[in-house]
């Protein structure tokens, strides 16, 4: 009986080691410098911003419609803002692999990053869904010319979003609130 138990343990441990080593050795990052993110480390804010272990991350290359942020003078949700937020949350939650490639910081001290879900740029998913405007033509490529070009191409081939560009909508909201 003991040899059978020992044999079973050896088989299970060998398989477990083999499976995990295959998984690790087959991992290929979606982009140079990409870092894998664990879902439990993510908190959701809106369509283009989330937190990673408490630090705010802003998705590069896009701008999604706003959701209410009274502390910033945005008192109501922009049309499609909830849809963009919910889509981002659903896509991230369902992804088997979440990666980000950190860039610089914005004026709000958020970390700027490209985000990949199962190898696809989140920015491109949002653009194709009509839930984001590209911002590459305004802010430049942020040191990622190839990714910026992919975002521009997706934007050219996607339907135009059915909402006011968020920077214009935000300006009007702040004027209404006196801020």
Task: Name these PLM-found stretches.
Residues 3, 7, 15-179:
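Small beta-barrel nucleic-acid-binding modules, primarily SNase/OB-fold domains
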